[in-house]
Curated annotation (Swiss-Prot):
Enzyme class: transferase
Matches recorded under SUPFAM superfamilies: Aspartate/ornithine carbamoyltransferase
Pathway the protein takes part in: Pyrimidine metabolism; UMP biosynthesis via de novo pathway; (S)-dihydroorotate from bicarbonate: step 2/3
Organism: Streptococcus pneumoniae (strain Hungary19A-6)
Subunit structure: Heterododecamer (2C3:3R2) of six catalytic PyrB chains organized as two trimers (C3), and six regulatory PyrI chains organized as three dimers (R2).
Entry binding sites for L-aspartate: 84, 169, 221
Protein name per Swiss-Prot or TrEMBL: Aspartate carbamoyltransferase catalytic subunit
Role description: Catalyzes the condensation of carbamoyl phosphate and aspartate to form carbamoyl aspartate and inorganic phosphate, the committed step in the de novo pyrimidine nucleotide biosynthesis pathway.
Keyword Transferase: yes
């Protein structure tokens, strides 16, 4: 048994995880990446419920479940009783009653999971696949795994997060845990898209002020679907003011890495030809998503077996 195996009742927010739990998930993800096997003979059942569009999170959870040998119960929102007005609570209550062990959920409502994990009747474990502009723990963990593979530590690393900060659950998840891990944080992007909560975790800067100093340069997608009004910038203006141009890429330190949670608006956040540039770890992030999600699923199922 690996010393990095652990039992977690739910994984819903980076705020709820200790540094030790986070490090074990990262290291267990690396073990899975290196070929660790964990077949489940009792065939636990997992259901993925995505109420918002997703490619990477949804499909990497599916691949993780396949690799672990789990049984997957398909849930199609479009053909479910949600279209008859059934609440999320009653949907999960039903799946729990049917014997589903784990529900992976993405939902537009921030903190949707609080009601579910507080219920004495719902016994299924909850993994948050993203709640509105709130939290995205599995994305944060795969980002951390990618950074850890590169540098072997977090203490003292300079990390810049740039883009649509206010609407990004990735930014909020990462800023909370990276500060606890000892990284120095910087936030860049349009003033219209940043709130004072970020000031508690790092410094507001322009991208040009910081790009030649950072170890990690993380860009965020412009989330048009979460904006109340039309675009503040044209694509060209945004890219020129806040995106990764060739000139900015050339200013990165030799050892710096480029990250983005994807999907990417090419030639907006990052110039098209730089998405797969030598300093980019974007593809590695996607790959790591499978293995860290295997670690998350394992930890939640271990908790169920212990109870």
């Amino acid at each position: 048994m690996s010393e990095n195996q652990q039992a977690l009742n739910h994984v819903v927010s980076m705020e709820d995880l200790t540094v030790d739990q986070v490090m074990k998930l990262i290291k267990r993800g690396i073990e899975f990446k290196n070929g660790a096997q964990l077949p489940y003979e009792d065939h636990p059942i997992v259901s993925n419920l995505f109420f918002e569009d997703s490619t990477r999170t949804h499909k990497s959870f599916e691949v993780a479940e396949i690799k672990l040998g789990l049984e997957r119960l398909d849930f199609d929102v479009k053909t479910s009783s949600v279209n008859k007005g059934e609440t999320l609570y009653d949907t999960i209550l039903t799946l729990s009653a049917l014997g589903v062990d784990v529900c992976v959920i993405r939902h537009p409502e921030v903190d949707y999971y609080r009601e579910l994990i507080a219920s004495p009747t719902i016994t299924t474990s909850i993994i948050n696949g993203g709640d509105g502009s709130g939290q995205h723990p599995s994305q944060s963990l795969l980002d951390l795994m990618t950074i850890y593979e590169e540098f072997g530590h977090f203490e003292g690393l300079k990390v810049a997060i740039a883009g649509d900060l206010d609407h990004s659950r990735v930014a909020k998840s990462n800023m909370q845990i990276l500060k606890r891990l000892g990284s120095e944080l910087f936030f860049a992007g349009p003033e219209e898209w940043r709130s004072q909560e970020f000031a508690d975790y790092g410094q507001f800067v322009t991208i040009d002020e910081i790009i030649d100093q950072v170890d990690v340069m993380m860009f965020l997608r412009v989330q048009h679907e979460r904006h109340d009004s039309g675009a503040v910038f044209s694509k060209e203006d945004y890219h020129a003011q806040h995106g990764l141009t060739q000139e900015r890429y050339d200013r990165l330190k030799e050892t710096a890495i480029l990250m983005h949670p994807a999907p990417i608006n090419r030639d907006v956040e990052i110039a098209d030809h730089l998405v797969e540039a030598p300093k980019s770890r974007i593809v590695q992030q996607m790959t790591n998503g499978v293995f860290v999600r295997m670690a998350i699923l394992e930890s939640v199922l271990a908790s169920r077996n212990a109870n």
